[in-house]
UniProtKB/Swiss-Prot annotation:
Gene this protein is translated from: pxpA
EC number(s) stated in the UniProt entry for this protein: 3.5.2.9
Any one GO MF annotation of this record: ATP binding
UniProt catalytic activity: 5-oxo-L-proline + ATP + 2 H2O = L-glutamate + ADP + phosphate + H(+)
Keyword Hydrolase: yes
Organism the protein comes from: Fusobacterium nucleatum subsp. nucleatum (strain ATCC 25586 / DSM 15643 / BCRC 10681 / CIP 101130 / JCM 8532 / KCTC 2640 / LMG 13131 / VPI 4355)
Disulfide-bond pairs as recorded: none
Quaternary organization: Forms a complex composed of PxpA, PxpB and PxpC.
Transmembrane segments: none
Protein name in UniProt: 5-oxoprolinase subunit A
Xref: Gene3D superfamilies: Glycoside hydrolase/deacetylase
NCBIfam families: PRK05406.1-3, PRK05406.1-5
A Pfam family annotated for this UniProt entry: LamB_YcsF
Length: 257
């Protein structure tokens, strides 16, 4: 049986004179990137530059829309109506798409950021609104969302292209959601453990939740981070370990049809 997976990372998350992450370095290790669109991070110049660098590295690009929350980096919950959620996503998707077009490339996917991502994964009204927006904008854009979530299931039911995402360094609740960042078990800190978990998720479609329960999971894409040199080394180790274990690493557009 053949196994393959995408490696994705969030990039373009600086703002003005402030730089965040090691974008050029992480692009050497991943197959897809999620570019901030100006609301939780990023700005027009960073968005343009990020698209250029991704194209030079032959890495697929996706939009990474967040809530309008620069001070909270898009990680704080907001009360928004479904129509606001749809409009927020479309506004940012359209902005990044303009830079993609200007650089003669196309957006591969859309992945929400932070609180927007977590809330839309489980809140039906928000998920439906975001999916409505994708249908209005471009049905060929892949929707990357939390594995096993309502958004993933509903997107597939609608016939949209959906990539189910897992996290190399995050803990899982028994219901398949991510453990809150402020709670024990939120992060997998040992590289060897994280790599073993990732391989298990891909090959067995199972992961061990924080309570010890084995839960179902699908892994089309693995989210990794490139915040510092150690993180880059970790991602490089993940990629090499996947390949050594017979798992092909490639962009979503190559296998999500």
């Amino acid at each position: 049986m053949k196994f393959f997976v995408d490696l994705n990372s969030d990039i373009g998350e600086g703002y003005g004179a402030y730089k965040l992450g090691m974008d050029e370095e992480i692009m050497k290790c991943v197959t897809s990137v999620n570019c901030a669109c100006g609301w939780h991070a990023g700005d027009p110049l960073i968005m343009d530059k990020t698209i250029k660098i991704a194209k030079e590295n032959n890495v697929a690009v996706g939009a990474h829309p967040g809530y309008p929350d620069l001070l909270g980096f898009g990680r704080r919950k907001m009360v928004v109506t479904p129509d606001e959620a749809r409009a927020y996503m479309l506004y940012q998707l359209g902005a990044l798409n303009a830079f993609a077009k200007a650089n003669e490339t196309k957006l591969q996917h859309m992945k929400l950021h932070g609180a927007f991502y977590n809330m839309a994964a489980v809140e039906k009204d928000l998920a439906d609104a975001v999916l409505d927006g994708i249908e209005q904008f471009d049905k060929d854009i892949i929707v990357m969302t939390l594995s096993g979530s309502y958004m993933a299931k509903e997107g597939k039911r609608r016939g949209l292209k959906v990539a189910e995402e897992v996290f190399a360094d995050r803990g899982y609740n028994p219901d398949g959601t991510l453990v809150n960042r402020n709670l024990p078990g939120a992060f997998v800190k040992e590289p060897d453990e994280a790599i073993a978990r990732v391989i298990k998720m891909i090959k067995t479609k199972k992961v061990t939740a924080v309570n010890g329960e084995e839960i179902d999971i699908a892994a089309d894409s693995i989210c990794v981070h490139g915040d510092n040199p150690k993180a880059i080394e970790f991602v490089d180790r993940i990629r090499k370990s996947l390949i050594a274990d017979g798992i092909e690493v490639k962009s979503l557009y190559e296998f999500i049809k």
